[in-house]
C-alpha cells in the first residue's frame, strides 16, 4: 500500500505545474542574421576585390551600430577566383582580418568549382583556396539560389 501511495504522490508531483517544470531545449545555434547580402566578384582586379571587401565591412559595421546582424557572402567566379586562391590572392590578409572581426555578424567566402576546375586544367595542377573557403558547384547557381531565399545581391 505504501508503494501505491508513494507512486501516486510522485505522479502528482511530476504532473503538477506547481512542482515540476518542463525542460525546454537549449538553442545552441546563433540567431539568424536579420539581413543577408551576397557580393559577386568576377574580375581579377585588386580594386574590384577591395571594393567588395569594403562593401562587406561597411555593411557589417553599419548593422553592428544598430545592434543588428548581417550575413555576408562574397562569391568569387571567373577571373575573380584569384581573390580566394592562396597563391594569387592580393587581398588574403585583409580577408583574414575581416573574418576575425565580423562577429556577431557572419561572413562567408565561396568559390565557383566550375571556374576552379577550368583553371586547374589550364594550369595543370590542383589549386588551393584560402582556409574556410566554401566551394560551390556553379557560382551563378549559388547567386540564383541565395536570391531566391531573399538575399540581396551586389556586384561592385
Name what the model sees in each region.
Residues 85-156:
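A cross-taxonomic marker for long C-terminal extensions/tails that follow the last structured domain
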Residues 18-20:
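Boundary at the C-terminal end of the N-terminal hydrophobic targeting segment
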Residues 1-4:
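Positively charged n-region of N-terminal signal peptides that target proteins for export
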Residues 41-53, 86:
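Short, glycine-rich nucleotide/cofactor-binding loops
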Residues 70-84, 115:
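Acidic helix-start/capping segments at beta-turn-to-alpha-helix junctions
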Residues 50-65:
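Histidine-anchored nucleotide/phosphate-binding helix
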Residues 31-44, 75-79:
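Acidic/histidine-rich, surface-exposed loop or edge segments in extracytoplasmic proteins
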Residues 7-16:
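Bacterial N-terminal signal peptides
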Amino acid at each position: 500500500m505504501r508503494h501505491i501511495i508513494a507512486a501516486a504522490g510522485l505522479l502528482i508531483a511530476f504532473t503538477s505545474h506547481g512542482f515540476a517544470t518542463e525542460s525546454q531545449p537549449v538553442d545552441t545555434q546563433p540567431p539568424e542574421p536579420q539581413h543577408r547580402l551576397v557580393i559577386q566578384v568576377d574580375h581579377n582586379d585588386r580594386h574590384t576585390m577591395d571594393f567588395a571587401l569594403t562593401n562587406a565591412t561597411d555593411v557589417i559595421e553599419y548593422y553592428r551600430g544598430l545592434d543588428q546582424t548581417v550575413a555576408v557572402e562574397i562569391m568569387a567566379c571567373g577571373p575573380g577566383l584569384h581573390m580566394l586562391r592562396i597563391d594569387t590572392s592580393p587581398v588574403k590578409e585583409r580577408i583574414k582580418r575581416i573574418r576575425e572581426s565580423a562577429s556577431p555578424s557572419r561572413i562567408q567566402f565561396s568559390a565557383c568549382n566550375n571556374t576552379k576546375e577550368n583553371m586547374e586544367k589550364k594550369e595543370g595542377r590542383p589549386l588551393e583556396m584560402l582556409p574556410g573557403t566554401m566551394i560551390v558547384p556553379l557560382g551563378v547557381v549559388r547567386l540564383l539560389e541565395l536570391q531566391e531565399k531573399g538575399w540581396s545581391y551586389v556586384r561592385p
